[in-house]
Amino acid sequence: MKFSENWLRSHVPIQATRDELAATLTAIGLEVEEVIPLGESLGQVVVARIVEAMRHPEADRLQVCSVDAGQGELLQIVCGAPNARPGLVAPLALVGAKIGELTITAAKLRGVASNGMLCSAKELGLDSDAAGLFELPDDAPVGQALAEYLGLPDASIEIKLTPNRADCFSVRGIAFDVAAACASEVVAFDAGAVAPVSTRTLAVELDAGKDAPRYCGRVIEGIDPAAKTPVWLAERLRRSGVRPVSLLVDITQYVMLELGQPMHAFDLDTLHGPIGVRRSCAGEQLALLDGRQVTLDDSFLTIADAGRPVALAGLMGGLDTRVTETTRNVFLESAYFDPAAIMGRGRKLGLHTDAGHRFERGVDSALPPQAIEVATRLVLELAGGTPGPVVHAQLPQHLPQPARILLRRARIARVLGIQIDDVDVVRMLRALGMQLDAVAEGWEVMAPSRRFDIAIEEDLIEDLARIHGYDRVPTTLPGGASRIAMPSETQLDELSVRRQLVARELQETINYAFVDAALLERWQLTNGLVPLANPLSAELAIMRPCLLPGLVATLGRNAARQAGRVRLFELGKVFAAAADAGAAPQESQHVAAAVCGDALALQWGEAARKVDFHDVKGDLMALAAASGAQLEFQPSTQPFGHPGRSADIYRDGVCIGWIGQVHPRLAKALDIDVDVIAFELQLGPLVQRTLPCAGELSRFPSVRRDLAFLVPDEVSWAAVSASVRTTVGPLLREVQLFDRYVGQGVAPGFKSLAMGLILQDNSRTLTDRDVDAVVTDVVAVIEREHRARIRS
């Protein structure tokens, strides 16, 4: 936001110097980026009129001008500006004037004497325009000091605003903060109604609901099309970074800069029928003021007459209804639009305007009626005309309502760590335009409509801290006892999980928590998804329901770049929609791994082989061993897994994850031409650590017995081993599966499982009779429970 220092001081009388004002603005959160002094060395620059201009006899691009500078005689000035002409009023630097580093002297240019210099705005340091002489109004008093005529000296101040301070996109909004910081008051502002003279109106229809709940319009007829922007108004615009265009456009820009309310002026004679605020129809076209023809979708707000859109609401007017140098009848517009309805629409069209910048951050919903009265008064004063009544259409139920906030003394002290006197609290908040009612605990505060960023008690306390001064808050060290957090023995921390996986030659990767909906469809993961309201892009619009889609995609990108052995893992949050409508999504921490390529790094002593299910299961079991988790595996029916090489993972009877080979069809769809083995499971159940319980080491020898059973194909090793453990009890030290065989000698529908039982007692040496009894019991149970038979 750029503005004139003198303009600001006209709204808030303060004694601070320019440097003090800049320091104050920065201290209260309105960071000053640049201060450009204007007109401080124009003591010998006057208003002058060119009486005669003749071509220089020795130079085609120079003119010899006779100039009236109010000194009783004409001065001869040699000038090279393309717009130098008889009758032009422009600044003249007299001999002895200092313009920047240049001192003006009498000189000869190509043999012709020149007694001064006609100046451009850039040469005077007033503007960046160097196209020609600074053209002043024809009625500017010849001979008057230019600084006096232009209201100089002044300064152009540019501040950097945070997104929450949209109220400071106006001179008056800034004035309230300055008044509070400098113990001053903002000058009262007269926005009284202008009485209508005619009855001419345009009906207004609001058809966009909450997106456009307030719209004010006024017809003014009989405007003088030859009226020019007065120098005081043009200079305020120029010093605020806005180039004057024409009177009507300049008035709307002036109101926007002074009050913060964007406005638009239509040529009334180009409008047909009532004005409507509505959503655009897909495919509608509109020629904009910048000359572009745009095709709209149904997400834009438009201002339309009876037959067509005539403006993009909150962004830019239409070319066909613009005001021109012949406009005599005008329709002024001032409206409030919901920021969400404007946000992002300009970027769709590659369009950035001052109006859009303000509307998408928020504009005071109470301003439109005031702004249209101020603009009307300026039009009548500068261009004449006959005003009609203001048409004020609104949907009160959709207008923002100010909240009453309880501000407690104790809360101020607790948040800021200092006590602020009640008198100072009241003074600062009232200077900011807030209404206060004293209560026992403090005050009930209602913020003005322009401060829509004030919603909770802490917002008010932040304002007090800004205005009171952060530099006045004493520096204190935090107190309290320092405690060393002891790691829980019942919990395996994430760092340990990472170290375990790294020790298994896995490398950690971190992927986006957002995924492409199309990718999830390929994985057939479409239930319970959490979509983003404002995604970074269409490809990152869903919060990930699990880690594997992103992890496998990363593995695929690496495999496609000649990485022969890829071993990745990731720890991260996953998200699921809540079962109850309106409840917050659920999130949980998962761990996943995905590998492909060779099982081992290339070495001369081992034959190369590809990684398989059992390799990755070994990685998972090593991780489980770190927490003492006893995992069980059951065949899985997940659609993204290979039907014969995947399993669901259970702990204590609860499914906590999945392990297996990614389905070949899915891998092909992802452009991965190698087998991918992966697992993913919930981290919470996995890291619940079983505390070690030290037992007595047996002094007696262990005994091993090997058994082989023919069991039906559908019977899993997990079920068989569970039966063995239950049957043998405390004598069993370990049961190991050391062979699985299908083929010759084994009937179809069966498989051979060979296991080793390791038995040991702590109190005695087991005899053959003891061991034989155990083996007999094991054989009987397995044959009975699993329809198995001992293999001979």
Swiss-Prot record:
Protein name stated in the entry: Phenylalanine--tRNA ligase beta subunit
Binding site for Mg(2+): 453, 459, 462-463
SS bond list: none
Lineage: Bacteria, Pseudomonadati, Pseudomonadota, Gammaproteobacteria, Lysobacterales
GO MF terms, alphabetically ordered: ATP binding; magnesium ion binding; phenylalanine-tRNA ligase activity; tRNA binding
HAMAP family: Phe_tRNA_synth_beta1
Chief place of localization: cytoplasm
SUPFAM superfamilies noted in UniProt: Anticodon-binding domain of PheRS, Class II aaRS and biotin synthetases, Nucleic acid-binding proteins, PheT/TilS domain, Putative DNA-binding domain
Designated gene of the protein: pheT
GO biological process, one term: phenylalanyl-tRNA aminoacylation
Domain of life: Bacteria
